[in-house]
Amino acid sequence: AIGHYQIGSIAVRVLSFTPIPIDDAFWIERIRIAYELRKTLRLAGVENNNTFRLIHGEGDNLPGLVIDMYAHTAVMQAHSVGMHYARHQIAEALKAVLGDTLQNIYYKSEATLPYKANLGSEDGYLFGGEVEDIAIENGLKFCVDWQKGQKTGFFVDQRENRSLLEHYAKDRSVLNMFCYTGGFSFYAMRGGAKVVHSVDSSATVSYTHLRAHETAANL
């Protein structure tokens, strides 16, 4: 096998069980396979949805890497030293696979890389620049702050749970604690909840929630 070595409990993150070069063609092929799978699952390339997880670590045979898509922006997060060093190759592969639909790549790994590696990584754009994309999930619109927000800016992996809440929300009172972007709140409102309370201790998060509400056409 071949993979990324790193000091710690996980010594090697395996990229391939066959002796193949980890070159530009490798990254393009892995990302292409992941993208085609998302289209098959109707997570990508469909109306009323421009937000999805393109790369989910081991699930896409790229352990240590997470890439979330928000409209025309890819937010890349490395959880291993090897992925950090490959970030520019990965960025070029993203551009090759996604083409003109990709306008920005933001690298956000300062808080996810092992501190013992002492890499001095800084968050920033690898491609494109300052932009504010509106994330659309199942027709609902959200303001995503991938620079200052938690994780990559939005909890993309909670899509099914948000939809489930919408199904059960009709005529109910809903309390959304630690609401962050208000994802669950908006789904509950669209589902017919009588009242929805969104609570978060962070003033920044509360402001983001308010901006999402003002994005209009949410309901």
At which residue positions do the language-model features occur?
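Conserved alpha-helix/loop element of class I SAM-dependent methyltransferases that forms part
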Residues: 157-169
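Non-catalytic accessory regions of SAM-dependent methyltransferases
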Residues: 1-71
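Single conserved hydrophobic/aromatic residue that forms the stacking wall/gate
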Residues: 212, 216-219
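Non-catalytic substrate-recognition/targeting regions of SAM-dependent transferases
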Residues: 58-62, 66-68, 87-154
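Conserved SAM/SAH cofactor-binding pocket of Class I
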Residues: 167-211
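Cysteine-centered catalytic environments shared across enzyme families
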Residues: 23-49, 76-119
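Conserved hydrophobic/aromatic pocket- or pore-lining residues that grip, position, or stack substrates
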Residues: 72, 142, 161, 178
